[in-house]
Structure formats: C-alpha cells, structure tokens
C-alpha cells in the first residue's frame, strides 16, 4: 500500500467540500464505509452477499441521508464462518491506510450450519480510534450485519463518489445491491414492526424512495413478512400510520434527522 493517509485531514477536507460541519461523526463513518466496502470487495468477501438498507441507498443510489451501519442479506445458507477472513481484512486495510488502532469484534458464535427456524443476524463491530490524541473523544464504531434471509432482487452498481478526496479506484467498485423496490419493501415491513422504538430514518427513506419512483411490491412485502416471521402486520401498520401526526409534532423526528442530513437539506425539507 502507498504511504499512510492522515484520517483527520481527510475528514476535514470532506467536510469543507460538502459544507458538512454539523455532520462530522457521520462523515467519518461514511469515509470508513467506503474503505470497508472496497477492501471486502477486493478480497472477494462480498460475492455471496447483497447490500441493503439505508447505507446502500446512500452509497449506491445517491440518497441525501447519511447512515451508520452496513447491512447485507446473506441468504438462508449463510453462516458467519463464510466470512472468517473479514476481521483480518478490515483490520489490516484500515490499520495500514491510516495508521490508526482498528479492532473488529466478531459474532460471539460462528455457526457451522444455518438455522432455518428463526432469522439470524450476525454482527461484526468495527472500532476505530480516529483521534488517538483526544482521549475525550469516543472511538468510531460501525456494525456490519448479515441476515440469513434472501434478497429477491439485485442489481450491480458502482459506489457513488461523494467526496473527491476518495481514491479513484473506490468508485470503480461494483456492489451487488437490492433494487429500490426491495429496499422499500424492507423498510415498509420494519417501520411498523419495530415496536420498542420509532425508526425515524425509515420514515425519511420511504419518502425518498417514493420520490425516486420506487413502488410498493405487494409480493415482496408478503415474502418479507414470511422471512421475518411477522404477525399482525396490518394492525401494526395502521397503528404506526395513526401515530404519525404525533411523531412529527413531538420533535424527535426533526432532532434525529439533523444528525443525518446536511443543513441545506434540512432547511429546505423540514423547516
């Protein structure tokens, strides 16, 4: 690898280019997202996975919302033993590129065989000490989650180059990603089904998906409900719809989105 890159200087330049001073934590995460996807793709570790979720919208479809974690569908035969090289791959690449302390925590138990009785999500947590001289700042943490459920659609898309400070080769990286229609189905299912917290970012994404021309595919939604073993969906959906006026009024939606969209987008969309 070429000489090390100073991560803090990279972040500062990305923030300056995009006028993103209020979003430093998610800009840091996004730069690391690019690194992680690039090194895993180069190592052939993404071949059996399909990128999904909010970060896939941001990095493959140019969504205006920043994201935190990397989510993939691995299919029913997935087990985390398939990705045994992931830890070393990420630690070596990020460590060598930035000279920072990087640790990857693997799933507690590597499953030798897939379990069909329930949805299983394996999580890797990546921790990067982005400012070693600042003991008061927390480490940057990113989760990679792979669920043993299928993706029913896919397309191949290049990573969107959101910053000119990124290496040229990053935007040549081809990622297998769900179609907008399937991401919409995922989010329609998860938005009302998560009862212990409100998924404000899913609200934003669903509106954005509609603006991009994505449509509701009833067959995909039905299949997702089966995959995730969700009951009483219509009741949960109606309850969530009924609660939307209060969700908007109480202010938590606005506060959440301030952390994930540029101030220019916030001012034109939510103020």
Q: Which residues does each PLM region occupy?
A:
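Anion-coordinating catalytic cores for phosphoryl-, nucleotidyl-, and glycosidic chemistry
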Residues: 66-67
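Structured mid-to-C-terminal alpha-helical surface segments
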Residues: 1-49, 60-63, 75-271
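Glycine-rich beta-strand-to-loop/alpha-helix junction loops that act as flexible
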Residues: 52-55
């Amino acid at each position: 690898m070429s000489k090390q890159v100073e991560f803090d200087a990279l972040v500062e330049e990305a923030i300056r280019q995009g006028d993103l001073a209020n979003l430093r934590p998610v800009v840091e995460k996004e730069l690391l997202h690019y690194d992680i996807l690039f090194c895993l793709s180069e190592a052939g570790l993404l071949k059996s996975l399909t990128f999904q979720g909010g970060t896939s919208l941001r990095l493959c479809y140019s969504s205006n919302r920043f994201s935190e974690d990397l989510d993939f569908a691995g299919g029913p035969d997935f087990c985390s033993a398939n990705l045994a090289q992931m830890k070393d791959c990420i630690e070596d690449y990020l460590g060598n590129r930035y000279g920072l302390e990087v640790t990857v925590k693997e799933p507690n138990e590597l499953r030798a065989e897939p379990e069909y009785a329930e949805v299983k999500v394996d999580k890797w947590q990546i921790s990067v000490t982005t400012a070693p001289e600042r003991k008061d700042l927390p480490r940057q943490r990113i989760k990679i989650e792979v669920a043993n459920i299928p993706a029913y659609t896919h397309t191949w898309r290049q990573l969107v180059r959101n910053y000119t400070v990124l290496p040229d080769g990053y935007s040549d990286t081809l990622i297998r990603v769900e179609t907008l229609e399937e991401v919409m189905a995922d989010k329609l299912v998860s938005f009302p089904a998560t009862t212990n917290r409100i998924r404000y970012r899913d609200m934003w994404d669903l509106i954005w998906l509609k603006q991009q021309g994505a449509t509701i595919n009833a067959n995909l939604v039905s299949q997702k409900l089966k995959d995730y073993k969700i009951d009483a969906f219509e009741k949960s959906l109606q309850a969530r719809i009924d609660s939307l006026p209060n969700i908007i009024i109480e202010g938590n939606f606005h506060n959440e989105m301030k952390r994930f969209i540029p101030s220019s987008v916030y001012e034109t969309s939510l103020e």
